[in-house]
Amino acid sequence: MLKYKKKLLLRYCLGTAVATALAIFAAEGIWLKGITGSFGDPIRFLRTMSLVKSNYNGELNSHQLFDGAIKGMVEATGDPYTVYLNQKDFQALSEMTEGTFGGIGIVFGKRGDDYIVVAALPDTPGAQAGIKSGDIITAVDGQDTASMNMEQIANKIRGHIDTTVKLSLKDKDGKTREVEVVRKEIKTPSVGGSMLEGNKIGYIRIAVFNENTAADFQKEMQKLQKQGMQALILDLRGNPGGILDAGVSVAGALVPKGPIVSVVYKDGTKYVHNSGLEKTPCPLAVLVDHGTASAAEIVSGAIKDTKAGKLFGVKTFGKGSVQGVFGIDNKTAVKITVAKYYTPSGVSIQNIGIIPDEIVELPEDATYDLQMRAAVDYLEKQLQQK
């Protein structure tokens, strides 16, 4: 999930216009009953609302009708990342980007008709239950996901702390299983690192790009440099992305002067985020996998295209779109795909992903981290050549 960080835009003018139109229709008692002909879209909407309210044999209110209408509008885009955020959804999104939220700690996306786990965040109930990147979510608490959108699935997975949710999963080999996971408060410390033993190589893992990532990454870099770091392994495996600006900031500390990513909007407007760095700080290796997505792919793509470092692992997820969150009121919002992004070489990775410089598989039965080993071997050779 890539949240384009910008101020929430409150569309009071649109809200006032709709409310005023409804008030006029109510005051004049216009039912539009039996009227035929071609109506403008706003009139069609108001006529439908009037018909439903007047004739539906059941309990409902105007709030329910507007809620349903908004959902219908965003679902009509056919884009799984463009969604209506009700009060619960909006609060959950805010909590996640701030670093604390409730649930089981998995991030998923949509590919074709399938809802695929992008990552199970480390040390969360989802990871502890054995949920892995690439697992397909087929049902939540017995309800088939084919009948739900992404936000509805997320809502069913979230819930009160210490309650249980049951997920039906299918792995990459087509084997099915069910897991019961106890919901917990999910805290996502974004950045962690240390020096590797026996060499001058530092290691930094970024789990997710949230509001604290850029500052935490700089602190970790400074700490490791004081400890004698001469080369760096950046671990972005299982990183589902997050805030665009955070990814740009991290890339800007690693790649040389020039483009990091280009963001192209609907009207053709193009914003190029640039690095001002004179040179890369040290030899760099980046670990990626199928769970590396979104903002993590921005960093990976910039490093690969500028040859600031070398990528090790397997092909990344392939999410190359940018979402903006726009406030409807102070409790609800819409998340809309507002742009696509392109790596410094002008490539869109949407539904394609990034292929590492060196493909290194990591079998489940591996006795050690083959991808990490390949990165260490590469950096040790780089240091010997200095």
Question: Language model features by range: what are they?
Answer:
Residues 1-110, 114, 132, 139-140, ...:
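Intrinsically disordered, Ser/Thr/Pro/Gly-rich linkers and terminal tails that flank
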Residues 323-327, 333-365:
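Conserved P-loop NTPase
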Residues 114-121, 147:
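Short, structured beta-strand/loop micro-motifs enriched in basic residues and often containing a Trp
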Residues 138-139, 335:
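Hydrophobic beta-strand signal
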Residues 2, 33, 37, 118, ...:
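Cleft-lining beta-strand/loop regions that shape enzyme active-site pockets
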Residues 102-104, 284, 334:
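Short beta-strand or tight-loop elements
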